[in-house]
């Protein structure tokens, strides 16, 4: 008789650290899961492990929609290499879609908003047409598939509700195009986007880009050409290589 404990090894192996051949990856991520999604748009983010990566850009297993997550999984769950620099170009202010009013069933004080990519800012939750206040009447948690739990709080206005309604907006990765990956420099503000952000890696992180990638997007000829051009004379000093996708569709060799 008694209580016995055992320690199980984590499923994530400790990554091998090496700054030679530093990966700099441009793509999309579920930044709606962050406290400040806008802060993770078109900036170089250095990550050393899986936890840091998830905290930096969020995570979702839908690799077709969220290309940076595919690299996070490959680097930290499969191969075990670190660090790498992530540049997310999915902008919640631009790449988004409306969520029409949805009715949710409440079970044991929890309702699930069955939409992926929900933006918490601007989300309206109602119980019997009465708007609920986040933090006072309910809290939210993310599910592994990217959907959102609405957890009703005791003493809140919706405590006894059996159904809730939700309206708002969500990020839409399908609206990110090749031009967003290639990026540019805004003439009036000087703000760099897309591959132009590669220039910021050395002055901000004191690390030199070694391998440039834009997974899935680099199957596009324009993105591929931009990647190759960007490998030359980074910060007027450094050189790099790039890895591009090959279009495997029937018209890929045309």
Residue ranges, per PLM feature:
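Surface-exposed assembly/interface segments
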Residues: 1-254
């Amino acid at each position: 008789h008694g209580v016995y404990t055992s320690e199980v090894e984590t499923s994530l192996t400790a990554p091998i650290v090496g700054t030679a051949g530093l990966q700099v990856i441009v793509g999309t991520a579920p930044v709606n899961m962050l406290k400040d999604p806008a802060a993770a748009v078109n900036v170089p983010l250095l990550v050393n492990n899986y936890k840091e990566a998830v905290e930096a850009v969020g995570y979702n297993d839908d690799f077709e929609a969220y290309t940076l997550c595919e690299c996070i999984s490959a680097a930290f769950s499969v191969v075990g290499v670190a660090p790498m620099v992530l540049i997310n170009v999915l902008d919640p202010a631009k790449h988004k879609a409306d969520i029409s009013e949805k009715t949710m069933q409440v079970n044991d004080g929890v309702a699930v908003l069955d939409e992926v990519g929900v933006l918490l800012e601007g989300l309206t939750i109602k119980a019997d047409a009465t708007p609920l206040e986040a933090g006072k009447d309910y809290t939210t948690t993310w599910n592994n598939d990217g959907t959102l739990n609405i957890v009703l709080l005791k003493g809140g206005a919706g405590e006894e509700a059996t159904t809730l309604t939700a309206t708002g907006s969500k990020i839409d990765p399908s609206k990110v195009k090749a031009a967003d990956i290639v990026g540019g420099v805004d003439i009036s503000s000087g703000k760099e986007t897309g591959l132009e952000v590669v220039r910021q890696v050395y002055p901000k992180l004191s690390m030199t880009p070694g391998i440039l990638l834009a997974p899935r997007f680099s199957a596009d000829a324009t993105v591929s050409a931009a990647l190759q051009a960007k490998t030359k004379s980074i910060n007027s000093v450094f050189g790099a290589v790039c890895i591009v996708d090959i279009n495997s569709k029937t018209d890929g060799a045309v």
